[in-house]
Amino acid sequence: MKAFVFPGQGSQFVGMGKDLYDNNEKAKELFEKANEILGFRITDIMFEGTDEELTQTKVTQPAVFLHSVISALCLGEDFAPAMVAGHSLGELSALVAAGALGFEDGVKLVSARAIAMQKACEAAPGTMAAVIGLPDEKIEEICTEVSTDGNIVVAANYNCPGQLVISGNVDAINAACEKLKADGAKRALPLKVGGAFHSPLMQPAKEELEKAIKATTFSEPKCPVYQNVDAQPHTDPAEIQANLIAQLTSSVRWTASVQNMIKAGADDFTECGPGKALQGMIGRIDKTVSAHGII
């Protein structure tokens, strides 16, 4: 069974989507429509901007979303998944590709999400760190140990066995990284991200995004969407909306999502969007399935 998966922030690169824009009339129309909705020419930054411009949250999120969604929509009849999932931001891409959300509404929501998250990052500076080589339970335990009332760190992204991303206040992340390394982590490295995504520090962004999501019409998707907050398949529009709101302050349960998709019959995963991050994760979750980019 075919599954399509959609990457999140961090997969962006300057030049992304340019081939699509130059060689596909439908893609060009959709990119131009997005420029219009966003109120600035995001394609200029995507195709020939600087890394610094592209890594601003308010730019990165719409850029990755557009590259992913437009890649899927331009496949036409070849886009026929039995199920879909997206990693963090990629969940919005998956919902548009699966027809739960219209393209224009998706662009508006991804812009609202990015702006709300950037504001939350500026109000409560935080960061994230990738931890390699310790069991999830041990990492969770250390996060709890080093957290205090005003200085928290939580498990944010369960990416694949042996790789977990933690998120929180800068001091708490640094303290956790020291302790994790002392306790045997192969690596505990702070990431170059704008803030503490998928942690309680995103609460103001969640409240802001909730209004935008509730004001948007969602439809039943053409296939089940495995959502980050519970790693379960969803087709009910109200459930999808609630999970999308909860996602900003909840962990991304990617390992469990992929495992559950495989249990449901998925054996051929196509990553739709920039980079190969999800292909690598899927390979580490289960070596018996196929994971590739768009062929």
Explain the meaning of each model-derived region.
Residues 9-11, 38, 98-249:
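Alpha/beta catalytic cores of group-transfer enzymes, especially the acyltransferase/condensing modules
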Residues 60-62, 196, 251:
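Glycine-rich phosphate/pyrophosphate-binding beta-alpha loops
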Residues 181, 262-265:
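Non-catalytic positions within long, well-ordered alpha-helices that form the structural scaffold/packing
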Residues 252-260:
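A short, well-structured juxtamembrane/interface segment
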